[in-house]
A protein has these predicted regions:
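Aromatic- and acid-rich polysaccharide-binding/catalytic face
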Residues: 203-216, 221, 286-297, 301, ...
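Aromatic-lined carbohydrate-recognition surfaces of secreted/lumenal glycan-active proteins
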Residues: 182-190, 292-295, 315-351, 372, ...
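Amphipathic, heptad-repeat alpha-helical segments
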Residues: 2-29, 65-130
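Long amphipathic alpha-helical scaffold segments
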Residues: 131, 135-201
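Short, acidic/polar
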Residues: 190-203, 230, 272-283, 347-360, ...
Length: 502
């Protein structure tokens, strides 16, 4: 069917005829999921004869994750229900609506059984979404059916947002009954001392600061270190009585590793020697000032060194061991990029983010937690945008690992070029949550930070970088723009700290 090799299992979806070119291109990022953690699997995607064709070697049924322009919500990855491979095409928009209604209904039922108070506004939205979906099924015209299904999908997303708000309100209320102000860290990464005039504002918004100390920025050439800005930033944070952490020391990306290290492709032993030397040097320098370290980030799904996944797990463990050799009392955390496992849709990867983390934790090393990157709306390091319900579910998945989880946040406030951002990272291709504007960034920051902070297993939430005027990863992702003006997101985070945290 559709010219796919016979060894592949195939399903197809009829695509609306009026879909924009960019939305059609994003459909090629779709994937079929599998496994107990419902992570994406290697999926071949094609658009032919008005159909999205998905093929893979594994013939088991599974949900399909599809980037889709959801009315009033943005361009978001949206799940279907579990679908089987078959010759007859599915109706794409109808399956997305069915999948979202099902996802919201199931999560609502789970939380109700766990003690969540019924929410009439959620009930009403689900009823409306179901009614509109039923109307779509009865339409004889394919175009009319698509319009109705799209509206059902939009209403289901609104129901999901209402459900998350009800869940957050009740969880915060219960937690504040025991503790008026929570101990959770809310911080921002600082590559240098904050700009003049920001000192007091920073301390009002955040109770913590994280210094990246990333290998590429500190030791750009072998044995030649740039300590001045890092020393000043660490001393500034210590003098302000902020909780001081650092990392990621080893970021497995072209923007995180020095050029002389990137040349060691396929040489894990040579890489390990240089890596451990760097970790020992940095940890020794800041011993007594920094007690919590994000030792690595982005090892899962990384191919920059042409090193296999098992070697990357071993290298993460070796980096941690090098730090513990300096101080066995250190709290060490390792980071996970693309927590939904977007990279698994490409061939060459087997370990989902959850399996990668679980494997490391089962090694017996006393890690103090894991960090999950919620860098949404950028590509290739970031994840394609999800809604709050999808974010809550993936965070709860990592919560079952039994160690504290910290969350790193980043979302762009604009879509154009950013001279100081990682040249490999772009807003194009990452979807969008409502929009890529300063106002949308502020709403995103408040919504996603609040969701993370309400979870009892979350130990800290950190914004990716403070200012767009210095080198950074997420394009336009700072809380201060390149001209030195505070963005609205800064005040939204300050309000969260004031309401909920010490």
């Amino acid at each position: 069917m559709f010219g796919v090799p016979s060894a592949m299992h195939t399903m197809s979806f009829r695509v609306p005829t009026d879909l924009s070119e960019s939305a059609a291109e994003d459909l090629l990022r779709s994937s079929v999921a599998g496994g107990h953690d419902r992570a994406p699997t290697a999926t071949r995607t094609d658009l032919r004869d008005g159909h999205l064709v998905l093929s893979r070697e594994l013939g088991e049924s599974g949900p399909v994750y599809v980037p889709w322009p959801v009315p009033r919500a943005g361009r978001l990855v949206t799940p279907t229900t579990t679908l089987m491979f078959r010759d007859r095409p599915y109706e794409l928009v109808g399956e997305l609506a069915r999948g979202k209604v099902n996802q919201v209904r199931n999560q609502y039922a789970d939380w109700l059984s766990g003690g969540l108070a019924p929410a009439p506004d959620v009930d009403a939205a689900l009823t409306r979404a179901t009614h509109v979906f039923g109307s779509a099924l009865l339409e004889e015209s394919a175009d009319a059916a698509d319009r109705q299904a799209d509206e059902s999908l939009a209403i289901a997303h609104e129901a999901a947002d209402r459900l998350i708000r009800r869940y957050e309100d009740q969880v915060f209320q219960l937690r504040h009954q025991r503790q008026p102000k929570l101990d959770t860290a809310l911080g921002c990464r600082l590559a240098a001392v904050p700009p003049k005039g920001i000192d007091d504002a920073f301390r009002l918004a955040f109770n913590a600061a994280c210094m990246p100390l990333t290998w590429r920025s500190i030791e750009p050439t072998e044995s030649s270190y740039r300590w001045a800005e890092a020393d000043a930033a660490v001393n500034w944070a210590v003098s302000r009585n902020l909780r001081v952490s650092a990392g990621p020391l080893i970021d497995f990306s072209t923007n995180g590793l020095p050029d002389y290290v990137l040349k060691l492709r396929g040489e894990p032993l040579s890489f390990k020697s240089l890596m451990c030397d760097y970790v020992e040097t940095v940890v020794s320098r800041y011993r007594g000032k920094v007690s919590r370290w994000l030792i690595t980030a982005g090892a899962n799904g990384s191919d920059v060194l042409s090193i296999g996944e098992e070697d990357l797990i071993r290298l993460t463990a070796m980096a941690a061991d090098a730090a513990w050799q300096i101080d066995s009392s250190l709290q060490l955390v390792f980071g996970l990029s693309q927590p939904w496992g977007d990279y698994l849709a490409r061939s060459g990867f087997e370990y989902s983010p959850f399996v990668f983390a679980d494997t490391l934790l089962r090694s017996g090393l006393p890690f103090a937690g894991v960090e999950v990157e919620w860098y949404l709306g950028t590509s290739p390091r970031g994840s394609y945008c999800r809604d709050l319900l999808g974010a809550s579910q993936v965070l709860d998945l990592f919560g079952v690992l039994g160690v504290p989880v910290q969350v790193s946040l980043g979302y762009p406030s604009a879509a154009g070029p950013d001279a100081q951002s990682d040249p490999a990272e772009a807003v194009a291709g990452g979807g969008r949550w409502r929009d890529a504007t300063a106002g949308a960034q502020a709403d995103w920051a408040a919504a996603f930070a609040s969701l993370a902070l309400c979870k009892s297993y979350v130990s800290g939430v950190f914004w990716d970088h403070l200012t767009d005027a210095t080198p950074h990863r997420v394009p336009h992702g700072g809380l201060i723009d390149a001209r030195g003006q505070l963005k609205p997101a800064f005040d939204r985070l300050r309000a969260l700290r004031e309401t909920h945290l010490k």
